[in-house]
Swiss-Prot record:
Its main location: mitochondrion. GO terms for cellular component: mitochondrial outer membrane; P granule. It is a single-pass membrane protein. GO terms for molecular function: RNA binding. Residues 297-362 form the Tudor domain. Belongs to the Tdrkh family. The chain crosses the membrane at residues 9-29. CDD domains: KH-I (cd00105), Tudor_TDRD2 (cd20412). This is Tudor and KH domain-containing protein homolog. Residues 46-109, 119-185 form the KH domain.
């Protein structure tokens, strides 16, 4: 028994240890199994959603530097990016993430799209002359309009090089934004129109006259026809034909006939010319300044300062001819052409003054043109002694043309260059090209074709492209063609008017000064021309007679040179004198007691050198403007 008892105790302990060990092993294994079960990775399905977003809303959805997209990703927990398509009007927004996050992101994106206002586009047309005001310096004004309205504003450039009368302005934004932008643009147009009207009102007409009265048509000249002519005038409207020539705004400054008139370009140079004329008038109105710039010798082709007797102002002019005064053989008159306006007039040589060199900085503004596509209804032509021909217009046709163009009243017209012709304005002068243009009066009611109105009223007939025809010669018989009968030009008692003076502004003879003879002079009644408002006193020095006036330049050694254009020209003449030597042509029987009338080829060359041709300068500017625009 004792032996069994001794064995039982170890056996019991052994069984206990085995049991405990087994239990511990089971517990440890069970725990490891549970831990392994807890470490199992849960796999979730990734969703991808594609949303079509209009291209106009994509920038707003992305936000500046992606701020809106980052905010949506943070709120939803999904990843968002875009696929762009150039051939579609929408982009694709790709949303990736768990089902719940992608659904939330999709909801946020759709809500954002619904909250966006409708983006639309509109366009309006504005006059081309207002584009500068709308755009501003360096685009300052158009950027300000976009900033204040919130809409995108763009002034469209013409597709062709043609300079059109209207430009297209496009707006892009909401309806409210576009309305604000349109009001701002219309305000710019109104301001520019007001500025142009004020600027035009500051340019007084170069004559004092009443408004133009309607002119009867050739077929019927009674009062009823007058009224009917007015109705026709307001009813005849034409659209400009599609041509390749540039359209430019011009003023008609002087008219000889529809076949010969002068225009000025509308632009900043107009104000510069007005300032120049005001300065010249103020300067040359002072007696001491006129005495300082007295011309001791006047030559053909010389650019001078001359007073225009119809308004008393001083202008730049060129001497085209020197002739004796028909009323005083001891006086000479110069046939001058006003380079900035196109008028021509006879002025006493002692009333001309030297033109300061600084007054030549502004180019001459008058450009000679002819009305393209029309001919006189009568088909008559005038012929000069040299055989040159030009169209002869009825005086009332010229008056009607002046009324339609509002000559010298600074009404802006649209011109389109159609053709050119070669012509010479003086006998022996080199031919130059004169542009043939069509004129249109653009109003709110429509466009009025001046040439078509003349044809409709019977003053002209439509014709093909004009063939080259020389302008009226500037000889001693008919120096101004259609204006040869003008009282201003021919110094006679009858005739018409100056090229920029209307029919209701005629001379009454008060401008002719009668010089009563004294004991030392002949008792015959002698008249001498005197400019209105010129402020020039009677000259005390003995004037040159027709027998001794000379077309050559004065001798620098005998005449003191003054500061101005003569200093520059004198240096050029000296250079020519060193290079050219031609014998003087002497008339066969000169007067014994008078200097010889000499006119050499050298003199002709010098005179041509002294001329500053405004027409070619304007033609070059016309060509450049067409390409620049």
């Amino acid at each position: 028994m004792s032996l069994n008892t001794k064995l039982a105790l170890p056996i019991a302990l052994g069984l206990s240890l085995v049991t405990v060990t087994a239990f511990v092993a089971y517990y440890v294994l069970k725990r490891d199994e549970e831990e392994n079960d807890n470490k199992t990775v849960k796999i979730t399905k990734i969703n991808t959603i594609e949303i079509h977003v209009p291209k106009s809303i994509v920038p707003a959805l992305i936000g500046r530097n992606g701020s809106n997209i980052k905010d949506l990703q943070k709120k939803s927990g999904a990843q968002i990016h875009f696929k762009k398509f150039t051939d579609q009007d929408y982009d694709v927004c790709v949303v990736r993430g768990r089902a719940d996050t992608t659904q939330l992101a999709e909801t946020l994106i759709h809500d954002f799209i619904k909250q966006q206002p409708t983006i639309m586009s509109e366009s309006i047309t504005v006059p081309s002359w207002s584009c500068g005001r709308i755009i501003g310096s360096g685009g300052e004004n158009v950027n300000d309009i976009s900033h204040r309205s919130g809409a995108r504003v763009k002034v469209e450039s013409p597709k062709s090089t043609d300079k059109v009368a209207e430009h297209l302005v496009t707006f892009r934004g909401t309806k409210e934004q576009i309305e604000v932008a349109k009001k701002l643009v219309e305000n710019c147009v109104s301001l520019e129109r007001c500025r142009r009207e004020i600027e035009q009102s500051k340019r007084p007409p170069r004559h004092s006259s009443s408004p133009p009265s309607p002119c009867p048509s050739p077929g019927d000249r009674d009062a009823d026809a007058d009224a009917q002519g007015d109705v026709d005038h307001t009813r005849v409207k034409y659209k400009r034909p599609e041509t390749t020539g540039p359209s430019i705004e011009v003023y008609v400054s002087a008219v000889s006939s529809p076949s010969r008139f002068w225009v000025q370009f509308v632009g900043p140079q107009v104000a510069q010319l007005d300032d120049l004329v005001a300065h010249m008038t103020e300067y040359y109105s002072k007696k001491e300044n006129r005495e300082a710039h007295t011309l001791r010798h006047v030559s053909v082709g010389q650019v001078v300062a001359a007073v225009f007797r119809h308004d008393g102002r001083w202008y730049r002019a060129r001497v085209h001819d020197i002739r004796p005064n028909e009323f005083d053989s001891s006086q000479q008159v110069a046939d001058v052409f006003y380079l900035d306006y196109g008028d021509s007039e006879y002025v006493a040589t002692h009333e001309l003054c030297e033109l300061r060199a600084d007054l030549l900085r502004l180019r001459f503004q008058a450009m000679e043109c002819f009305l393209a596509g029309v001919r006189p209804a009568s088909g008559e032509e005038a012929v000069s002694p040299s055989g040159q021909t030009w169209d002869k217009w009825h005086p009332q046709a010229v008056e009607r043309f002046e009324e339609l163009t509002q000559v010298a009243r600074w009404k802006a017209l649209v011109s389109r260059t159609c053709t050119y012709k070669k012509t010479a304005t003086a006998e022996g002068e080199k031919d130059k090209e004169i542009p043939g243009i069509k004129l249109f009066d653009v109003t709110d009611e429509g466009e009025l074709d001046v040439g078509a109105v003349l044809v409709a009223e019977g003053w002209a007939v439509a014709g093909p492209a004009p063939s080259p025809r020389p302008s009226p010669p500037r000889g001693h018989t008919t120096p101004f063609g259609d204006l040869s009968k003008s009282k201003v030009l021919s110094m006679t008692g009858g005739g018409g008017r100056s090229s920029s003076v209307p029919k209701d502004h005629k001379d009454d003879g008060s401008n002719v000064l009668t010089v009563e003879g004294d004991d030392s002079k002949d008792k015959d009644g002698i008249t001498a021309s005197k400019s209105l408002a010129s402020g020039l006193e009677k000259s005390d020095r003995h004037p040159l007679s027709i027998s001794n006036f000379d077309l050559s330049y004065p001798d620098p050694s005998r005449n003191k040179q003054l500061n101005g254009s003569d200093d520059f020209l004198h240096g050029e003449r000296q250079n020519i004198d060193n290079e050219i030597t031609i014998d003087t042509l002497v008339p066969p029987s000169p007067l014994s007691n008078a200097p010889i009338l000499s006119k050499t080829l050298q003199d002709e060359f010098k005179a041509n050198m002294n001329r500053i041709d405004s027409h070619h300068s304007n033609l070059e500017n016309l060509g450049k403007s067409a390409f620049e625009k």
